[in-house]
């Protein structure tokens, strides 16, 4: 991973099928990302709440925009972020 490349953040939790689908798409499109498990990371859980979300997956793009759920168009758009 290039340290100068913007990083997308993916907030997940165990047994979340949409989370796994989003992660597969990020990998498929070659989008660099880091994963935060909100079930074990209180800071990540608070960040998700602060963004206004109550469920996972939550994707936080490097430009500060975010979305929840499996939105293929939004995920594809991250390739150009």
Report residues per predicted region.
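Structural micro-motif
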Residues: 49-59
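Short secondary-structure transition/capping segments
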Residues: 3-4, 46-49, 68-69
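Local sequence-structure signature of Cys/Sec-based thiol-disulfide redox active-site neighborhoods
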Residues: 1-29
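Non-catalytic, surface beta->alpha helical segment in thiol-disulfide oxidoreductase systems
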Residues: 61-81
